[in-house]
């Protein structure tokens, strides 16, 4: 295989967006809605969303208040929380994990999580008012 064989895509991003890249150890064990909730809780815990919710966050980021130093310190914690949740779910025999749901759709009897290794790379898009968001 060559690098030119790879699939690529592009997505428009904005300051304040969270990008999560991970192995199947995360996505087989943690539902996308739960990943979103965890990311939102992380934003609230570290003060990226306060006093007005997401609208206030977007206004603050648009005005150039990116909190980039705090983000650099806090973003590893989000990856850690997600990995921990994946491990917890992988060991839960009663959970209908994303893997279990897909298995059942394909007539494979599976319940619980899917024991697997997990790697998560979490990124927080930051910059100042004059930065391009491309």
Tell me the role of every PLM-derived stretch.
Residues 2-22, 26-134:
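C-terminal catalytic subdomain
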């Amino acid at each position: 295989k060559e690098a030119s064989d790879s699939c690529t895509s592009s997505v428009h991003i904005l300051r304040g967006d969270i990008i999560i890249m991970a192995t199947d150890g995360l996505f087989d064990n943690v539902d996308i809605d739960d990943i979103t909730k965890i990311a939102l809780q992380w934003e609230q815990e570290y003060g990226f969303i306060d006093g007005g919710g997401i609208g206030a966050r977007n206004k603050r980021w648009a005005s150039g208040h990116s909190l980039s130093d705090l983000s650099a310190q806090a973003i590893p914690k989000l990856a850690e929380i997600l990995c921990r949740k994946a491990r917890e779910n992988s060991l839960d025999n009663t959970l209908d994990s994303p893997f279990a749901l897909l298995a059942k759709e394909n007539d494979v009897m599976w319940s619980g999580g899917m024991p697997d290794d997990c790697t998560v790379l979490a990124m927080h898009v930051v910059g100042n008012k004059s930065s391009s968001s491309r």
